[in-house]
């Protein structure tokens, strides 16, 4: 993997970081998570580690996957980098803080992918509809390739329709939309994640993998 300024950049606008040392057998499903608005409370364009707060219930979700030996993979769009609001250095600090907050709850993530490409960006990051940017499925497919995942059996949790579309296009069949509505997108069944009952349904799905 090419690195830039010490960061795990597979290309100028794509961060791919293995954040655990766990080895998974090929063919495992994964739990894909969006970051901002799903793991942590969304603050717009997050560049301040001190502002990071975990969303209620997310530690339980990750704990269930950790206990089942299910890879936990973060897939996050970060257009603020392309727009010049902050750089990879700020992203790294914020992301480290999010992972540290999870570690304080004794849960962990296995891989983080972040896409900085956006049509409103500048320079090498000014690419419209980049295949790695959700709703395109590139980050999920890249994680699937690197970890040997069974994408069809994998689950996703996100707070935007783009998360669900990316999952559908990557071949997943089950997703949960934070504060959203249930729906069907092709073969992807989308469940809402709004209350304790919805959370129990997600935990049961993870425990059944």
Task: Give the location of each predicted region.
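Asp-based, Mg2+/Mn2+-dependent phosphohydrolase catalytic module
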Residues: 1-31, 88-110, 119-156, 160-209
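Active-site neighborhood of HAD-like aspartate-dependent phosphohydrolases
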Residues: 2-73
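Short glycine-rich loop/turn motifs that provide flexible caps or phosphate-binding loops at active sites
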Residues: 36, 43, 79, 83, ...
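Short, basic/glycine-rich phosphate-binding loops at helix/coil junctions
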Residues: 39-42, 73, 113-124
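Short, active-site-adjacent cap segments at secondary-structure transitions
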Residues: 39-40, 79-83, 119-121, 163-164
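Short, acidic loop-to-helix structural element flanking the phosphoryl-transfer center
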Residues: 46-73, 82-97, 132-137, 141
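Short beta-strand segments at enzyme active-site cores
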Residues: 71-77, 110-115, 177
């Amino acid at each position: 993997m090419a690195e830039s300024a010490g960061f795990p950049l597979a290309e100028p606008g794509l961060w791919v970081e293995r954040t655990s040392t766990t080895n998974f057998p090929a063919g495992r499903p994964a739990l894909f998570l969006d970051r901002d608005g799903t793991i942590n409370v969304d603050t717009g364009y997050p560049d301040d580690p001190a502002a990071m707060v975990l969303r209620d219930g997310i530690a339980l979700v990750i704990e269930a996957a950790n206990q089942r030996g299910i890879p936990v993979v973060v897939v996050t769009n970060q257009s603020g980098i392309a727009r010049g609001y902050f750089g990879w250095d700020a992203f790294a600090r914020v992301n480290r803080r999010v992972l540290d907050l999870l570690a304080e709850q004794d849960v962990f993530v296995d891989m983080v992918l972040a896409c900085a490409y956006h049509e409103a960006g500048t320079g090498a990051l000014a690419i419209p509809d980049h295949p790695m940017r959700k709703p395109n499925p590139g980050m999920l497919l890249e994680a699937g390739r690197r970890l040997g995942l069974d994408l069809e059996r994998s689950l996703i949790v996100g707070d935007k329709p783009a998360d669900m579309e990316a999952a559908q296009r990557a071949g997943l069949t089950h997703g949960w939309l934070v504060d959203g509505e249930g729906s069907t997108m092709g073969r992807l069944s989308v469940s809402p994640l709004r209350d304790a009952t919805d959370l129990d349904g997600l935990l049961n799905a993870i425990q059944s993998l």
